[in-house]
């Protein structure tokens, strides 16, 4: 494998690394001042939500017409209420799958396809072919059907040309009619064109959809009130978590000891909440936020700040994971490293005696990470650009951090996650390879201009430019095509029967959704001012009941 011309010189690398700074935290101690509602008020909210939940359950159980069933399930999903009725929804979808329906109604066909595929039914996309004319264009009479087809088509797998064609057709049509639509439908179309329904971060979809649903003429007031209370109760829990995590973060004293890193603890919790938003995943959010904090610190030390020698010493200490390894490290790394070991011990305590063995996997995940970082440092120092994207991804998909964060999320879950499942996850199965490839490619598109000037190893974008002699624009467009391919890969795996619990693939897909959100327009984690309003919407602004 021949060395290619350097992206930048070693002296440039070292100089830029030492001078690099990121903007400070946008949140500081904001969540330390959080005051929960009084106990009576919280109790009233919880009791009222419980009453409404059972009223909605009656609606779910009494639904018996295909269109009404589909509309109800979609509404509950978008409002973040579907997890309260999993068994009932599964029964209804089984009924829908086995029942006759009007296959000439494009809106119904699209919604049926969308919900069945979303729940793992491998239904055929051939149902859409009858809506095409001789030229291959779709015959669609109304915008609602157009939007339903657009959303359904994004649950495609490889080889489904009818869905590929549907996306191109519907996107063009929706863009052309957007300015003429009434407000509520225009809001829906705008959201869809930004991110199709299946790929949206679920808790953000809930927060965004509540005010849209409130404007709908056909809204159900009981469902609406329950959705608002359910979200507000979750928001209170998130704020409690943020208060504890901010206190934990302050003890690390990053402003003094690690002033060069990205101080993004609130954004980290936001990211983890996007992937694991349910009440029962509180411990999961806490563990994964802390793991993400350490991944960020390791990344910023090894990729941006340290010398090669310092980075290798840190890697060796991570491999050892023992207190006396701190003696190897430069002074600025020692406190962080010892705090990492302390965190492992505290997580053991939080997990309890029957699940404390899982901390072993957190340590192994960090070892895999720094092994990859070490290889990337070698590439950088040798001025090496991998000859193909595949060669690049063999290392870089493991260093984007998505593998570590996704796997660590399962450490905090219930007894459904066994040692055998954690061993399987650590073996890097196809599902995780597809997801981490997607995250790496998305990250590289968003970060490539910044990292071109920052003394980094070559990204997949630069690798493609070197391999094919293209411009940065053309390379980014090609990488975007590859991200679409990874979505198809993940969808195929989602539809493939497996012995693993459904929560595994659902969570992995949720991490892909959060990554798409974070890297959609820029690297929103690094430049977090771009998502400050969204974070406030999720954590600070309750819905008005």
From Swiss-Prot:
Pathway: Secondary metabolite biosynthesis; terpenoid biosynthesis. This is Beta-sesquiphellandrene synthase. Mg(2+) 3 binds at residues 443, 447, 451. InterPro entries: Isoprenoid_synthase_dom_sf, Terpene_cyclase-like_1_C, Terpene_cyclase_plant_C1, Terpene_synth_N, Terpene_synth_N_sf, Terpene_synthase-like, Terpene_synthase_metal-bd, Terpenoid_cyclase/PrenylTrfase. Belongs to the terpene synthase family. GO terms for molecular function: beta-sesquiphellandrene synthase activity; magnesium ion binding; terpene synthase activity. Mg(2+) 2 binds at residues 299, 303. A motif (DDXXD motif) lies at residues 299-303. Keywords: Cytoplasm, Lyase, Magnesium, Manganese, Metal-binding, Plant defense. Mg(2+) 1 binds at residues 299, 303. It holds the Pfam family Terpene_synth. The gene is TPS2. Induction: Up-regulated by herbivory. Its cofactor is Mg(2+); Mn(2+). The keyword Manganese applies. Gene3D superfamilies: Farnesyl Diphosphate Synthase, Terpene synthase, N-terminal domain. GO terms for biological process: defense response; diterpenoid biosynthetic process.
